[in-house]
């Protein structure tokens, strides 16, 4: 689903609204997003349709992120920086996806099949980085993918809850991913 600029802003506002007010009515969600109930009703019809639209848009955005970062060809460190930046550009949708997470959300045999191309692209990227000697080889590419997702999604959730400042998130994520929590002065 390709959204025009106005719809993109609306969907981001609705993603935040539904996370901040999970039991809100469509009218309350419309108010939180800064539109009328009639506009929201025309946009999605029902709350279930809204959730489906947000999930569909999340899938589209994640695939666009993968494409924009050129993970197959770019130098791994440069691609990692772009990957972090692109994810943070869409932090509202990431927060929504975290909010929607269920234990079977990523099950490749169920509804999670829709996320497999995203996960496979990240796995392939980290494997390529390992093969080029950029990322360590004692951790599997799949685990790197899980760690990356956990760090990025955790950071955007921490920002939402006021526990992290968004201004430094990209640098913090890059440093944690590449160097861990050890004190650089002790190296």
Curated annotation (Swiss-Prot):
UniProt keyword list: DNA-binding, Repressor, Transcription, Transcription regulation
UniProt superkingdom: Bacteria
Identification of the protein by name: HTH-type transcriptional regulator NfxB
Protein task: Confers resistance to guinolones. May negatively regulate the expression of genes that are associated with cell permeability to drugs.
Annotated SUPFAM superfamilies: Homeodomain-like, Tetracyclin repressor-like, C-terminal domain
Alphabetized GO MF terms: DNA-binding transcription factor activity; DNA-binding transcription repressor activity; transcription cis-regulatory region binding
InterPro entries reported for this sequence: Homeodomain-like_sf, HTH-type_TetR-like_transc_reg, Tet_transcr_reg_TetR-rel_C_sf
GO BP terms in the entry: negative regulation of DNA-templated transcription; regulation of DNA-templated transcription
GO CC terms of this entry: protein-DNA complex
DNA-binding region: 26-45
PANTHER family hit by this protein: HTH-TYPE TRANSCRIPTIONAL REGULATOR BETI, HTH-TYPE TRANSCRIPTIONAL REGULATOR RUTR
Provenance organism: Pseudomonas aeruginosa (strain ATCC 15692 / DSM 22644 / CIP 104116 / JCM 14847 / LMG 12228 / 1C / PRS 101 / PAO1)
